[in-house]
Regions:
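Outer-membrane beta-barrel translocator/receptor signature
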Residues: 1-62, 66-72, 125
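Acidic/polar loop-and-plug regions of large Gram-negative outer-membrane beta-barrel proteins
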Residues: 44-48, 61-67, 71-134, 138-140, ...
Length: 196
């Protein structure tokens, strides 16, 4: 957070149906600058390069600072982000992109080898604080703490490449078995940093 006024709003549009808006506000809450805040946010959506793939992100980051004197500083920090659609996580094979297919053609640049119902979403939360107090020119105490939680949900089927040798039975079987991932994952972390 800053004690000087900050007021910023942004709008952005671009190719692939990109639409984005964001804001960043910060200021002191009192005349002495003892209390200050900052609020930053973002909303974004776009189509990914591959067909049927989208990106969506919503984030907000509130922060609050308490400075009772010039030797003490306590800042509360937080960040919340939701990505209902994170875009395309597949890959395109060498056959059909770098090298032509046996029929001489190449895959389109928006080719999606996955299933139409592929999804990958992510939700992140972080809260913490930063504290320091200067006793004198020699001794200062600092502590930073952060708790983070990350949840992901995935449902996807994807290919391993193009079967370039149809006479090979193993290749036929290998190309027919597309791997699938489905799951929900949760990670929680605590980070503490002390300095004296």
């Amino acid at each position: 957070p800053t004690t000087e006024p900050l007021k910023e709003v942004q709008f952005k549009a671009g190719t692939d149906s990109l639409f984005q808006t964001g804001f960043d506000f910060s200021d002191a809450l009192d005349d002495d600058g003892v209390y200050s805040y900052r609020l930053t946010g973002l909303a974004r959506s776009a189509n990914a390069q591959q067909k049927g793939s989208e990106e969506q992100r919503y984030a907000i980051a509130p922060a609050f600072t308490w400075r009772p004197d010039d030797k003490t500083n306590f800042t509360f920090l937080s960040y919340f982000q939701n990505e209902p659609e994170t875009g395309y996580y597949g890959w395109l094979p060498k056959e059909g992109t770098v090298e032509p297919l046996p029929n001489g053609k190449r895959l389109p640049t928006d080719f999606n080898e996955g299933a139409k119902n592929n999804t990958y979403s992510r939700n992140e939360k972080m809260v913490g604080y930063s504290f320091d107090h200067e006793f004198n020119d020699t001794f200062t105490v600092r502590q930073n703490l952060r708790f983070a939680e990350n949840k992901t949900s995935q449902n996807s089927v994807y290919g391993y490449g193009v079967c370039s040798d149809p006479a090979n039975a193993y290749s036929k079987q290998y190309a027919a078995l597309a791997p699938a991932d489905k799951g929900h994952y949760l990670a929680r972390k605590y980070v503490v940093d002390d300095e004296k």
